[in-house]
């Protein structure tokens, strides 16, 4: 798996998936145009897309195989983005 930038945000309050996603998208937008590829909630086990494969973290494998280059963690939520700058992948 390729190495990607990782940003961790620990809010001192509980947030919903929707709130955490807004935080993550706001942060990602500062790096360039991005697309959210996958998400995982370590507390409930929720993941999107709901893929099963590889014996590893399938949501991470899915995102990496589609060019993820930025992981943003907000509390227990993990968001994987592919960031592009001026039409090219960041890396």
Curated annotation (Swiss-Prot):
InterPro entries noted in UniProt: DUF5619
Transmembrane parts of this sequence: none
Superkingdom of origin: Archaea
Protein name: Uncharacterized protein AF_1514
């Amino acid at each position: 798996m390729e190495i990607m930038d990782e940003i961790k945000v620990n809010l001192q309050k509980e947030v919903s998936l929707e709130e955490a996603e807004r935080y993550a998208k706001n942060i990602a937008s500062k790096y360039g145009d991005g697309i959210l590829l996958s998400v995982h909630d370590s507390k409930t086990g929720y993941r999107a897309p709901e893929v099963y494969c590889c014996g590893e973290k399938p949501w991470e494998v899915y995102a990496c195989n589609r060019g993820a280059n930025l992981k943003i963690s907000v509390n227990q939520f993990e968001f994987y983005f592919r960031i592009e700058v001026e039409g090219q992948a960041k890396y």
